């Protein structure tokens, strides 16, 4: 826990002030005091609430009104002694619950992943003695010894550092290691700039040091994230909410119909109670689309597989559907919208300015003087040759071609960009021998090397332009040395910085005779400026296309980055992001209240110098405006924003395990274009889900109406509960998968996102279900009325009706392929799924009609061939009627 302390945050305090505020010393606290503080502050562990046991989570999947209907029907069947019917109905309910249980979200794993990041033991100094203790026993005031490879056990203020570098990517998302210091810092600094603090869960990459515990357990930065994650409520997707409402509406309709028919049959038909109950159970079972939850889950699963082939791993099934409704995508810049390969685009010398081709680490691309279409030729001994040798040799990175043919760099991206630039030009061979080196240091902001280069001894320097300008009195030109023209250089740097380029300068000086060592003092005079390189992380070409596709599809793309506003706006313009001419910073967002933030979140598309906490607030602000939000992230701090978003998108390559666990979707290539592909697939899946729902519902209505008509007419029960379940679970489910493989419609990415408030069962859908369901029911009833007086057995009549309904289903599946056009198109032949399920359906129907054990189980009997022909003709007639209905209702559908 954290001690209560007024005043400045720990990173602004000196070591002495920090020790005093937590009542400790360099020798640490005593064991007795540690025990007292442990009692006061609690264990150094992330708080967690107990999860539900698996059996309870399984039982929860029976909490559905339509499942209640099935369970009630099974109970009544048991009371009546119809054990086979009861077993079949119960099996259907259990299968639905199992599918829901298996597909259940694993969101709680993200919390466990955070807890797993804590180390198990730490070396603490107590009363001057080094003790290895469980990390759970650490308390504020403990002095912790840290070494390379250690995982930081709590939030610490550094009190001693020896080349201490820490990998904080899991917390900040920044891939570069952070050099730690003991000095106090000033200003309101973001997490990644607090270089005298160590954060729980991060890893020491090199060096050693000591730190004093200032926060434990839930009060650490990791604890705050854990608390945010635990407090985020799971949100249901639009389709799941709509299906809940549909289920309740069907439940109410079933109750009303059963009550009305019960009263009618008792008063006007004088039916035996047992026969009446059997009919009402059949009505209830017929009205429940038992297979629909399983069908939806399986169709979503097929969408998951399709997206996986496009490098998008879907972790939570409903995400597939939500992608199709997404209205805003908030994306990181580096690596997602850009190549994540820093590339030199311009070189400034005293004589000229050059532009450089190339957008990656591949050393390919010509160099041109500005306004000159002819590539430059690098003359031996020229200024440009010396400049290229300097950036090549004063450089700790290496350029490597992997076996796959891809080019990679080792070392930092800035040095790597300079190394690639030097490799784009073939320089005359020249022997070189490194004599001494000053590594890059964040305090001095340059690196320097002492080389024997051919016959001369030289000192080479690369670093921040403002620093090298202070070191240089002269500039090199092809005509010789000139006094440094500072206004020229500053003007050019400002010009290119406005275009989003990061600037790095290079300089040299002749070495002293016999010099073998290099010190900072050697650079205080005689340094000559050679040139300045402007570099950037270029946009991914496919991201530019993907953003254009998103904008055409009515999806706004917002770029969220830690870069400076000017850089962010420049990249935004290249990418074609909507309002890229304006940017807002994280500092400006922090001072806004929720109302102001919700306005800014919609007004701006470029968010610069932001923190992961800003992301979380931006998601909430956009959601408050009824936006369906996608959010990308890679660091642990991004996890709350990803969990809060409607679609959280984690980076598969640079993302942490915690982020992936919190996300709904993981990109295996960290590429924005993959998100756009997933949106396209999500829309296709939703279209096919809607077609499937429109396909399934008329069958249930037809079954229910057929039973109602039979009861009103006093006829024999046309379908038994097990036959109804056969149709709902076997034939309907089988045929539904044919629609799951339908290709996306041509305008799928040229229409706006669907409004999640519009129910999947809208006005037209209700009409189509009522129209087709009534037509099938009336056709089957007429056939039943024709068969009954001719002396056929109830089993034969039910078998004919079953085959009639199934054949009508098959033809209606073909109707559902195309929403408002003719269904028998070339796409029908391309959809192999339809022909596979048609073959499976034929086998199933042959089994239930002709296999003796199936006849005994379902009460069917064999049919002569002519009845297959009759049912085929009836089904084909209904197919033609629905095709004629499409153009007549097209205007209604459009409205």
Language model: regions and residue ranges:
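Conserved cytosolic headpiece of P-type ATPases
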Residues: 1-750, 758-761, 774, 785, ...
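Membrane-water interface at loop-to-transmembrane-helix junctions
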Residues: 756-774, 794-800
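Generic alpha-helical transmembrane segments
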Residues: 731, 776-777, 799-813
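A C-terminal functional module that forms or caps the active site or interfaces directly
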Residues: 816
